[in-house]
Amino acid sequence: MDDKQIVIIGGGLQGLATANALLDRGESVIVLEKEEDIAQAASFANAGILTPSHSMPWNSPSDILKILSGIGKKDSPMVLSPKAIPSLFFWGLKFLRNSTNKRFLGISKNCIDLANYSRSLTQEIRAKEGFEYDNAENGTLKIFRSQEALDKAVKISKVLTPTAEIDILDSQGISLAEPELATVANQLVGGIYYPDDEIGDAYKFCKLLEELVRSKGGRILVNTEIKKILINKGKVNGVITDRAILQTKRVVVAAGSWSHALLKHVGLKLPVRPVKGYSLTLDTAGLSSKPKLAVIDDSIHTAVTPLGNRIRIAGTAEFTGFNHDFHPKRAAYLNNTLKAIYPNLYSQLDLEEGRLWYGFRPMSADGLPFLGQTKLEGLFINSGQGHLGWTLAMGSAALVADIITNKSPDIDPNPYLAGRSL
């Protein structure tokens, strides 16, 4: 292997988008993925929404209260496992430090800037390559069950995105925006419609990226596990996989929640930890009437998204480390969420055929991704997007590729730099 080739660790959204961005800048790349197929972790069956209009981290003061109130509760939208507290202690202190209202608003603005940039790049590649991935550009609808929550969300939107187009809806407006909500609209105090948001299947997008990367000369190796990143005198000089030793002077770690462990072996502390999320995907083919908008119930951090002839219920946040158990209460929670939002649809679906899934979101301690150069020469990071991985993917990749190739970025990369201090 030519040591000028850049090794990208991770074949999910971040890794594949980075590979494509580097190829467009004239670089040679090889993507290494430990699973049998690309995009098998957080990219596989996520909520399927791109939300530049309200890309906010999960470290608001109110979210902190939800997390603390969910300690040990499997039926809570946000769960903190007592067993995971020791491993999350120092990360948690940094998370709390960034949860003041001032920090939350500042970080949210940074997220929204990157999200808007990312959306433009997503639209660009879709138009150029003719990508189709059950995508729709018809916005998202956030619903509220209390006036206080709605008022707070409207206020935050006006502060963070004063020029963005949003529609504040009453219960009648909700029914007009999404007719399938008509039966529950009287239970809602209102909603916010964000016309600039999009939906799409992240896994299908990744498969299209995979094909595109290969067509441009990039290599993608699946079933290839990284054992070690080789460092000599503060510089990258290769990686050891379970297949071979690859010589390279540049490595991008885009391994999601597993990035922390890979970097720990080379003496770097990355404040990114896994936050477990769940989804349930059901077939809606043949139904005469079905939802057209992604609907987000902000009170429980859950979204219901139409993706072609499927509907996906996704959400919840478990701070449990790499816990691979699928608790029955989570399946019931997702079913009950669908029933509460779309009772008519719920009664028509074959729940036995639904596909349950969980993944680990790579959550940074401050809510922003870590992008670019580390203190080790030739070692770069693209990780920490958390629940905004789909929303931030193309923009994150472009910034990392610009940093690697010394190209002037289109937006300020400083808030997201890998070497920032928390």
Give short role names for the model-derived ranges.
Residues 4-31:
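N-terminal Rossmann-like FAD-binding beta1-loop-alpha1 element of flavoenzymes
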Residues 4, 181, 231, 368-422:
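C-terminal lid/capping helical subdomain adjacent to the catalytic/cofactor pocket in oxidative enzymes
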Residues 46-49, 54, 58-98, 226-236, ...:
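Active-site substrate-recognition segment that forms the wall
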Residues 106-119, 142-152, 192-211, 325-330, ...:
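Short beta-strand to alpha-helix junction loop
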Residues 151-161, 184-242, 246-249:
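Helical element adjacent to the flavin cofactor pocket in flavoenzyme catalytic cores
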Residues 45-172:
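Dinucleotide-binding Rossmann-like beta1-alpha1 core, especially the glycine-rich loop
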Residues 24-44:
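Glycine-rich FAD pyrophosphate-binding loop
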